[in-house]
Design a protein with these regions (language model features):
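Helix-coil modules at protein/domain termini and other flexible surface or pore-lining loops
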Residues: 1-167
Length: 167
């Protein structure tokens, strides 16, 4: 359920000029011009002038920050039933990213792990040729898990994914 009272419409530039604090497009893993061309209109460039719908959130340090609604909610397309909310196709569907915990601390830890996982997945998805394959261990829990999946007919490879978190 999306609380429409937390939504704001505008470009990052116009929202910043209005005194709000939108996330910068450069802070996200985005499609390159080449990828946008390759997908033949499925996605659009996301920059400071892109008109979109934003949702209010908070940074880890408690600062209010606006982020594109399409990067937060899986069901963002349903917003058209409730009003005019521009949502350009600036990103692939966000099927993950929800985090919770029994305490504030555990929720924050889970959220940080989710951010790292999503960032690594997007780096891998958008740059598969740049990710070197790593050797699969011969013994131990990872080897057992790999064997379990191979026994079910799956092909397994492990890749190294460079990311801004150095993990």
């Amino acid at each position: 359920i999306i609380d429409t009272r937390t939504l704001v419409t505008g470009s990052g530039k116009s929202l910043h000029e209005a005194g709000l604090n939108p996330a910068r497009p450069a802070d996200f893993v985005l499609f390159s011009q080449e990828q946008i061309a390759r997908f033949e209109g499925r996605f659009e460039l996301f920059d400071e002038n892109t008109l979109t719908t934003w949702v209010k959130g908070r940074t880890f340090h408690g600062e209010e920050r606006l982020v594109p609604v399409s990067m937060v909610f899986v069901n963002h397309r349903r917003l058209s039933k409730f009003g005019r909310y521009p949502i350009p196709p600036i990103n692939a569907p966000a099927y993950a990213g929800i985090s919770a915990g029994q305490t504030y601390t555990s929720a924050c830890i889970n959220a940080l792990q989710e951010i790292m996982e999503r960032h690594a997945t997007m780096c891998w998805w958008h740059n598969p040729a740049n990710n070197p394959r790593l050797s699969i261990p011969k013994r131990g829990p990872v080897a057992s898990l790999v064997q379990e999946f191979k026994a079910k007919g799956n092909q397994i490879c492990i890749v190294g994914i460079e990311n801004r978190f150095n993990m």
